[in-house]
């Protein structure tokens, strides 16, 4: 992988349904909820504050927080009435259904939750447990409703504490109603954490929900299959494809046992399996799953779905360099989309982007640019119903094509437009961080190192806030370190390389090319800082890895060997150590600076060699 790699994403269907936050009924559901094929963030919610306590008789005020309302409710004696909680919960649902707004619903839900807590406290034994369910399950449902309203307001951080409380309330050992409440709470908490970009915590919640569901229903129930697929999709988003594949296989087995041959459920499973196989580079198996899914959709008369699968088949053919077959698949899908959705629909634009990429790869740059322009015309004047995620995704893919044809300024404009579309959308911080990282790469390649560092820094800040510890985060840290090197911020670069090393060693291992690249950069930085022994230690480690595990055929081996020999020689006469240009340490082929400029620049930055 190059020193400054771009970002890689898994191709998913462009017409997947958005995730909607629904307020649960007051009665527990008899079955776990069925989930969509793919989760996407919901539309932008209102960010207004909740209304104050209704018992005061005051008008709504956007300045009163939910915590204030909760404090007011604590001493209200009417909350001890066991009939008040269900009544307030009904008012909350009615407020949303009637269009009064989520602020009134939030006020009712907070008071309902307080009432249920009072009633539960009066029941022995205390929570968790309690009689046969009653107030305990009502409290759990009220907390679910409260969290859902917070989510509808876009206040996802405030939705987490009620859900964390909700999963502690029911006792799954007390029967299916408690199990369902616990399952629903874990799944809702997982969705909320996902919207906050906390993917690892989200997956942990889904896993716990699946465990509870299996204990209650058995491991072959069709509803367990739906949850397995939901969790597999989350693993795909986290780029943990082996775990995703294992769960998807289990889902496929369950659906094949309970459904007719070539069912729609099986087709959905195979489409997900194709995404996983494609991401792992197993294109032949991906193609097989897509063909079987297409046959099932054809048998069910799902013309638009067949066209979506044709696009995925085209993607596989392009990966296999079977370009004529890819063009045929794309054109077939394009004909269906134009006829069924209209010539200005975003799905049409998405096929234009695929064709643009294909013609770029085959060297037909004029045709590629023409398809890019056709797609941009659609994205610039979107039809009603087009989501900003669809537009941002399309612009991002087009920017990659412009970047590859050496038009970085146009590519940057498209990425900036994508960021602007997503910046106010909940749950998009990780996606924005990815865009900023790509912008940093482009700024770096055109020599705008200060802009590159700022872009990487913004991306790193967002990824840290989301608790990111993936290999991608390590790569971004390495890229930011390289930008700091170009700005002569040596200490900062060293810290970034050290952090990147720790993450990549954990996620990829010491023999991965990205990890080896960080080792090399860190050794060069230590050399520039005068930490010769540290630089020698790292280079000796790299050479040992190459000699014992990776082989010495790599062209970097000889360069690293020469660098180590020089460092060992210099370590023997450290008093006469000659300061080097950091640019030469990172890039041995770089031209040395003039003596007079070097003599002025290094002392002013305080470097000690």
Curated annotation (Swiss-Prot):
Family stated for the protein in its record: Belongs to the kinesin light chain family.
One GO cellular component, as annotated: cytosol
Keywords: Cytoplasm, Cytoskeleton, Repeat, TPR repeat
Entry keyword Repeat: yes
Subunit-structure text: Interacts with IQD1.
SMART domains assigned to the protein according to its UniProt record, in alphabetical order: TPR (SM00028)
Region (Disordered): 1-77, 582-609
The species this protein was found in: Arabidopsis thaliana
Pfam (any one): TPR_12
Compartments where found: Cytoplasm, Cytoskeleton; Cytoplasm
Protein name: Protein KINESIN LIGHT CHAIN-RELATED 1
Keyword Metal-binding assigned: no
């Amino acid at each position: 992988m190059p020193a400054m790699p771009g970002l890689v994403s898994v191709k998913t269907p462009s017409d997947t349904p958005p995730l909607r936050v629904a307020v649960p009924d007051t009665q527990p559901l008899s079955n776990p909820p069925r989930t969509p094929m793919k989760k996407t963030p919901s539309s932008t919610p209102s960010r207004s504050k909740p209304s104050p306590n209704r018992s005061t008789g005051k008008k709504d005020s956007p300045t009163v927080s939910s915590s204030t309302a909760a404090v007011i409710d604590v001493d209200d004696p009417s909350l001890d009435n066991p009939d008040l909680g269900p009544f307030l919960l009904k008012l909350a649902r009615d407020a949303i259904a009637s269009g009064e707004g989520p602020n009134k619903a939030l006020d009712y839900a907070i008071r309902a939750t307080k009432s249920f807590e009072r009633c539960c406290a009066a029941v022995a034994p205390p929570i968790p447990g309690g009689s046969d369910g009653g107030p305990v399950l009502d409290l759990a449902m009220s907390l679910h409703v409260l969290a859902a309203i917070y989510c509808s307001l876009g206040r996802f951080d405030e939705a987490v504490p009620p859900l964390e409380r909700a999963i502690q309330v029911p006792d799954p050992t007390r029967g299916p109603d408690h199990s369902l409440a616990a399952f629903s709470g874990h799944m809702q908490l997982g969705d909320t954490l996902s919207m906050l970009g906390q993917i690892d915590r989200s997956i942990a919640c889904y896993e716990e929900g699946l465990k509870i569901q299996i204990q209650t229903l058995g491991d072959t129930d069709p509803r367990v299959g739906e949850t397995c697929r939901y969790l597999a999709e989350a693993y795909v988003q986290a780029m943990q494809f082996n775990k995703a594949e294992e769960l998807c296989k289990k889902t496929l087995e369950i659906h094949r046992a309970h459904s007719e041959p070539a069912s729609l459920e099986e087709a959905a499973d195979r489409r997900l399996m194709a995404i996983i196989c494609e991401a792992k580079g197993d294109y032949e198996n991906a193609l097989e799953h897509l063909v079987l899914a297409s046959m099932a959709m054809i048998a069910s008369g799902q013309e638009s779905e067949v066209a979506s699968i044709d696009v995925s088949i085209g993607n596989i053919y392009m990966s296999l360099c079977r370009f004529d077959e890819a063009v045929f698949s794309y054109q077939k899908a394009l004909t269906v989309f134009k006829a069924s959705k209209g010539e200005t629909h975003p799905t049409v634009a998405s096929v234009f982007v695929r064709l643009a990429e294909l013609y770029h790869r085959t060297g037909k740059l004029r045709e590629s640019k023409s398809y890019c322009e056709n797609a941009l015309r659609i994205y610039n004047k979107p039809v009603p119903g087009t989501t900003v995620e669809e537009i941002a995704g399309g612009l991002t893919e087009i920017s990659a094509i412009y970047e590859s044809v050496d038009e970085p300024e146009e590519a940057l404009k498209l990425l900036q437009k994508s960021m602007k579309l997503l910046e106010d959308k909940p749950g998009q911080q990780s996606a924005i961080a990815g865009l900023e990282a790509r912008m940093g790469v482009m700024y770096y390649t055109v020599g705008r190192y200060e802009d590159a560092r700022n872009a990487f820094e913004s991306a790193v800040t967002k990824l840290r806030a989301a608790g990111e510890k993936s290999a991608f985060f390590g790569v971004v840290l390495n890229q930011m370190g390289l930008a700091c090197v170009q700005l002569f911020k040596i200490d900062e670069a060293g810290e970034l390389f050290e952090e990147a090393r720790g993450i990549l060693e954990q996620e990829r291992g010491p023999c991965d090319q990205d990890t080896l690249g960080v080792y090399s950069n860190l050794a060069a930085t230590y050399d520039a800082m005068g930490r010769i022994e540290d630089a020698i230690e790292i280079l000796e480690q790299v050479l040992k890895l190459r000699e014992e595990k990776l082989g010495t055929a790599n062209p970097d081996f000889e360069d690293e060997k020469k660098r180590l020999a020089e460092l060992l020689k210099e370590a023997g006469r450290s008093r006469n150590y000659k300061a080097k240009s950091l640019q030469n340490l990172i890039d041995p082929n770089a031209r040395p600076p003039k003596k007079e400029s070097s003599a002025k620049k290094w002392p002013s930055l305080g470097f000690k060699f």
